[in-house]
């Protein structure tokens, strides 16, 4: 009986979640530009494996639910940057002046006593014709949400929302960075 209880308490199921990027709404002020950026490489260089995002842990810190994205993290990040650039009229489908690359250094969401998400991305901008690096910057965001459910019944989708907010914050700050925008002139 003790072995059965220990197995039940230590078993960890994996749940796949979606992530979304919401372009700025009409009442949010964003600076539009000219289509000049093409998304090139998005590299997932996190310490987590594949689409892994994190876990929900019980009161003693044992993982009870493992959280994975439904798509590779590099694809989620590419989609977010694509939507962000397009909503600001910066995405060039053809004949881009600049190539956008990014390294996803950290993107994870978890719950122990609160729902937490962290996202850290290094963005690079290259001249398309010469391949010369003209801009490189780190962007970081952390989001936290208090949740009354800290148990097996915790909702993995709520953690996905918090993680999506962290990713959105990083992507929006990167695309709206005044230093980056000055490079585009």
What residue ranges belong to the model's regions?
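Sec-dependent signal peptide recognition
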Residues: 1-2
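A structural "domain/chain start" motif
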Residues: 12-75, 79, 176-185
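C-terminal/domain-edge helix-coil "capping" segments
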Residues: 13-30, 88, 129, 133-185
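Envelope-exposed proteins and targeting segments
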Residues: 33-35, 96-100, 115-121, 135
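A short, hydrophobic beta-strand-centered structural micro-motif
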Residues: 34-41, 91-110
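Second-shell loop/turn segments in exported
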Residues: 63-71, 112, 152-157
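Stable alpha-helical elements in mature extracytoplasmic
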Residues: 73, 77, 81, 163-170
């Amino acid at each position: 009986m003790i072995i059965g209880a220990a197995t039940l308490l230590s078993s960890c199921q994996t749940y796949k979640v979606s992530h979304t990027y919401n372009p700025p709404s009409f009442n949010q002020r964003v600076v539009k530009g000219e289509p000049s950026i093409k998304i090139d490489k998005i590299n997932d260089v996190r310490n987590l494996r594949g689409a892994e995002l994190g876990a929900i842990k019980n009161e003693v810190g044992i993982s009870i639910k493992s959280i994975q994205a439904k798509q590779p993290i590099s694809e989620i990040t590419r989609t977010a940057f694509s939507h962000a650039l397009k909503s600001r009229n910066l995405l060039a489908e053809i004949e881009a002046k600049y190539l956008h690359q990014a390294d996803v250094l950290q993107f994870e969401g978890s719950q122990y006593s609160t729902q937490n998400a962290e996202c850290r991305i290094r963005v690079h901008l290259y001249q398309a014709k010469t391949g010369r690096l003209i801009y490189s910057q780190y962007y970081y965001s952390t989001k936290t949400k208090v949740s009354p459910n800290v148990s097996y019944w915790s909702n993995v989708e709520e953690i996905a929302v918090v993680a999506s907010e962290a990713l959105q914050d990083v992507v929006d700050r990167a695309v709206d960075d005044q230093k980056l925008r000055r490079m585009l002139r």
